[in-house]
Amino acid sequence: MQIILNARELCETDPTERIQNAVDTVFRHGGGEVAIPEGDWEIGTVRLRSNVTLHLLENAHLLGSRETEKYCYCEKSGLEPIAGTDCTDALWEPWNVRKNYDFMSKPMSRWNRGLIRAVDAVNLAIIGENGSLIDGRDCYDELGEEYYRGPHAVNLHRCENILLKGYAVQNSANWAHALFDCRNLRAENITVRAGHDGIHLTSCDNVIIQNCDFRTGDDCVAGIDNRNVEVSGCRLNTACSGMRFGGTNVTVSDCVFYGPASYRFRGSLSAEEKKNSAPSGESGGGMLSAFTYYADFSRPIRETPGNILICNCEFRNTDRFLHYNFSGNEPWQRNKPLDSVVFRNIRAEGIRLPLTFWGAAEQKGNLTLQNIRVSFAKGADCALLYLGNYGTVLLEHLTAEHLDGTCLIRKWTDDGVVRIRDCNCIGFDGVMEESATEPFACRAC
């Protein structure tokens, strides 16, 4: 079944209600498509359902309301009642005082509000034509995350067989895509501008993200406890981390990570700017890290994270291209430690800080750098790599330029094996390895 909404009926009625009624009608008839016409349509929350495609036609714009209570979703149709166990009044709290993560794990929390939502749905899609847009309009919520973040653009819980394709998201008041416990997801040809995280995956399996263009205010691709994830052909630009990610069997290929960042992290805005939904504005700062490991306690991690391959990628003007710091001073790297990560066929330019690889004493991770060409920014004056609590570290076919520190590798522990093969440090007169005597210190990402 297909319902093509027309501009007149969307103008004459509440667009949220009209779109929701169309989705429900298609769902009742076994599935199909709801098409949104060209125009600017202000909405609160639309609940997507199984076997339904939301199709944004050319220049169709879904604009999020700036009234936070428009996102207080209530199932009125009786089609798919929300279980009481999925509801909570818990609000976001800072990590160092929160008692649990109910605000995040329960789909009907205030934190999980969104423009487009789905719970326990299968075979669903959001697709867009040229010029289609989901605009969160930086909706302010004084009870939201960090006391200013509003709803996500797309929020999916426990969904399977998902296609996200062809549209743009801008100014998302929290994550552009917040996906929890989802299976079999394909996201392709999506553009994300400003806002917060581009795609954030939590406990998701079998995910493909390809040919997407991220210029975000927070991490481009993020998440923990994910399995079987492929990211390819994407462009990633941010003031935070290109990828802040934890998972098992993860491949990142043919991507470009680059700075300086196009948009500021909204946390850096003044309280008045946040309250008034001011634009994020240009950043000009560098990307903190191309790849940052992520393993907080927002939920149990099912498998040991590892078998992560990052290959055939370019890193331009990122402060560092690897940040794994399990030393204990970063709350988002304290759950399960990382087993292994491989960087292969990487060209990195404008690097300003050492790669950090600091594992757990009880599980010493393994790092491989193969076919790497790295050029440091002028005045960086640092080692290539900081090491601690490591198993096997392999540097093979590596060329380094403008390396001005006293050593290639600085080690705080001597418990692992370092193998260096065919390493060419142009103009470098320091030593290959050096043991540190000072306490370990690392700027968090």
Question: What annotation goes with each model-predicted range?
Answer:
Residues 1-445:
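Extracellular/periplasmic carbohydrate-active domains that bind, remodel
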